[in-house]
Amino acid sequence: MLSCEGSVDYGVLHLKTPVLMILGHSDCGAIKAYLKGFNEETYNIKRELDFLLPIINKTANELNFEKQLSTTIQHNIDYQVNIAYKKYRDIVKNKKLTIIGAYYDFKNEFNKGYGRIIITNVNKNKEQILDLSEFNEVRNNVNEIYVGRLIE
């Protein structure tokens, strides 16, 4: 969201898109590079990733790197959804926009199958996602919706 704000604004404010999806993914190279330290990267790459610092601080005590990576990816999704929600709050409250946080799980970390998109957050709501009114129409047209979280 932060690195492409103008494009997102255009879609939400001018094209009136009804859904904004923030999609993170398994084994994210950008987050992996940030976690390992990225001293060799260019200034512009470092600047793109600087917003991760508050998120990294939440996962700094994880002993297992893979667990820290997955947890950081999900925190990043939540963080980006929160930013979008603050920015577009009035549009969301008027039911003109739904902000969905999702995790493209090509490593099967959620045990729902490889390559699934797992919904983790809707308009900052992380619980009872399938009960939200935003999914009324979707429930009738989709065989299965995958919802889950790796973190609380």
Where do the model's predicted regions map?
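Conserved functional hotspot residues or short segments at active or partner-binding sites
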Residues: I22
